[in-house]
C-alpha cells in the first residue's frame, strides 16, 4: 500500500480533518487524523493493518507478540498481530499512573515483540509503552504505526516504522499562528477529556 493509498483511506472515510484541534499531547494543530473513524470500518482497518504487518515483517522478520498502548492502539495492534500470526497484548494505565502490563500479559524470554501504535505525534505513548516493558524477558525489536505525523521526529528509543510519514505542524497553545488562533479549538481525541 502506497502512502497516497493510505491517505486516501483516511480522506474517503472522512478521517482527515482540517480546523483547530487540541491534540492529546496538549499541542494544537490545523490537521487531525480521526483514527476511530477508520477503526469503525473492519474492512478498511484490515487493509491498513495488513500493509503495516508487511512493513514490520520486511524490517524485523519474525514477530511473536504485538504490544499496544490502550485504548487507541488496541484495534490496530490486534489486527496487525492477526496478519503477523502473533499474539496481541496491550498495556494500560492506572488512573494518573504509568502504563503497565496487566491481565496476565507478559513477553517471555526468547520472544520478539513490536509496539504497534495508531498515530504517532510526539511518540509519548510509544515511549511510555516501551518503559513499561523494561522488566520483560523478551526482546522489543521496534515500533510501528499507521501514520507518523511528527515528520520522523517522534523518537521513541527504537526504530519506528510507518505506512506514511507526514510533517503536520503542531503549536504550543501560546504560540499559535494568527490564522489558527482565529478558529475556535476542538478536542476530538480521548486522553484527559473533561468529566460531564
UniProtKB/Swiss-Prot annotation:
The reaction(s) this protein catalyses: orotidine 5'-phosphate + diphosphate = orotate + 5-phospho-alpha-D-ribose 1-diphosphate
Functional pathway: Pyrimidine metabolism; UMP biosynthesis via de novo pathway; UMP from orotate: step 1/2
Keyword Acyltransferase belongs to the record: no
Pfam families linked: Pribosyltran
InterPro entries per the UniProt record, alphabetical: OPRT, Orotate_PRibTrfase_bac, PRibTrfase_dom, PRTase-like
GO molecular function, one term: orotate phosphoribosyltransferase activity
Cofactor(s) listed in the protein's UniProt record: Mg(2+)
GO biological process: 'de novo' UMP biosynthetic process; pyrimidine nucleobase biosynthetic process
Enzyme class: transferase
Domain of life assignment: Bacteria
EC id: 2.4.2.10
Entries under Gene3D superfamilies matching the protein: 3.40.50.2020
Chain residues that bind 5-phospho-alpha-D-ribose 1-diphosphate: 117-125
Binding site for orotate: 121, 149
Keywords (A to Z) from UniProt: Glycosyltransferase, Magnesium, Pyrimidine biosynthesis, Transferase
Assembly notes: Homodimer.
HAMAP family hit by this protein: PyrE
Role played: Catalyzes the transfer of a ribosyl phosphate group from 5-phosphoribose 1-diphosphate to orotate, leading to the formation of orotidine monophosphate (OMP).
Protein family (similarity comment): Belongs to the purine/pyrimidine phosphoribosyltransferase family. PyrE subfamily.
Protein name according to UniProt: Orotate phosphoribosyltransferase
Source organism per UniProt: Methylorubrum extorquens (strain PA1)
Gene it is expressed from: pyrE
Amino acid at each position: 500500500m502506497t502512502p497516497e493509498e493510505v491517505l486516501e483511506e483516511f480522506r474517503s472515510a472522512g478521517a482527515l480533518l482540517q480546523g483547530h484541534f487540541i491534540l492529546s499531547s496538549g499541542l494544537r494543530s490545523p490537521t487531525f487524523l480521526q483514527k476511530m473513524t477508520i477503526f469503525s470500518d473492519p474492512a478498511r482497518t484490515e487493509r491498513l493493518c495488513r500493509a503495516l504487518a508487511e512493513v514490520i515483517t520486511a524490517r524485523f522478520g519474525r514477530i511473536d507478540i504485538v504490544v499496544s498502548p490502550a485504548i487507541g492502539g488496541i484495534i490496530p495492534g490486534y489486527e496487525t498481530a492477526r496478519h503477523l500470526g502473533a499474539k496481541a497484548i496491550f498495556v494500560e494505565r492506572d488512573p494518573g499512573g504509568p502504563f503497565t502490563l496487566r491481565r496476565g500479559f507478559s513477553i517471555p524470554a526468547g520472544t520478539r515483540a513490536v509496539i504497534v501504535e495508531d498515530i504517532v505525534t510526539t511518540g509519548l505513548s510509544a515511549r511510555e509503552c516501551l518503559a513499561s516493558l523494561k522488566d520483560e524477558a523478551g526482546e522489543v525489536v521496534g515500533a510501528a504505526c499507521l501514520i507518523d505525523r511528527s515528520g520522523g521526529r517522534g523518537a521513541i528509543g527504537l526504530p519506528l516504522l510507518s505506512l506514511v510519514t507526514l510533517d503536520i505542524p503542531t503549536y504550543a497553545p501560546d504560540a499559535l499562528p494568527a490564522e489558527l488562533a482565529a478558529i475556535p479549538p476542538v478536542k476530538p481525541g480521548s486522553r484527559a477529556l473533561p468529566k460531564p
